[in-house]
Amino acid sequence: MVQRLCTSVAALSLALSACVFFPRAVMAIDLSRFYGHFNTKRSGDACRPYEPFKCPGDDTCISIQYLCDGAPDCQDGYDEDSRLCTAAKRPPVEETASFLQSLLASHGPNYLEKLFGTKARDTLKPLGGVNTVAIALSESQTIEDFGAALHLLRTDLEHLRSVFMAVENGDLGMLKSIGIKDSELGDVKFFLEKLVKTGFLD
């Protein structure tokens, strides 16, 4: 043990002596191989907790604060995709799908016809189903984009717009007039207000 300690002390002394007597030799260490290892973005399989968003095209990991900040950080610009940025402000797709599904389960397969028009019959199958509608509500920046994504008839789109306008203006009478009961008003209004607040009517 003592011999090992003496050897370590001797090696340290030799290294320090080299620094004193040959300073230029020590300073000649090539640090260029370390350049590039201090990126603000990380590549690889797993992302760090402070850079949890992985770009789908190039496996670059970026901070959540860099999403939708106006400057692309992913090679393909996915972090600035308008659908991604809209979905980030909206209720999660799962929450929207669950809400729509619960309305259908409670009130019948054609209940959402009151909101989305004639194509919303049969548990939204003509529109692609509950998940398709939930995704379109999440990703569509505006009601026009939503109508285009689901190929809504112009009359159905205008009806939906009038429903959203009623919610925005606090006109619960309009919602009652299309058959939404008092017991359902609170939930429907709460859900639609979330979309209105994120620019759905702009």
UniProtKB/Swiss-Prot annotation:
Q: Which UniProt keywords apply?
A: Disulfide bond, Secreted, Signal
Q: Where is the LDL-receptor class A domain?
A: 46-86
InterPro entries linked? IDLSRF-like_peptide, LDL_receptor-like_sf, LDLR_class-A_CS, LDrepeatLR_classA_rpt
Task: Return the protein name.
Answer: Prohormone-4
Per the UniProt entry, the signal peptide is: 1-28
Pfam families tied to this protein: Ldl_recept_a (PF00057)
Task: Output the SMART domains linked to this UniProt entry.
Answer: LDLa (SM00192)
**One GO cellular component, as annotated:** extracellular region
- What is the source species? Apis mellifera (Honeybee)
Compartments where found: Secreted
Task: Please list the disulfide bridges.
Answer: C47-C61, C55-C74, C68-C85
Q: Which PROSITE patterns match?
A: LDLRA_1, LDLRA_2
Q: Does the keyword Cell membrane apply?
A: no
UniProt main location, coarse: secreted
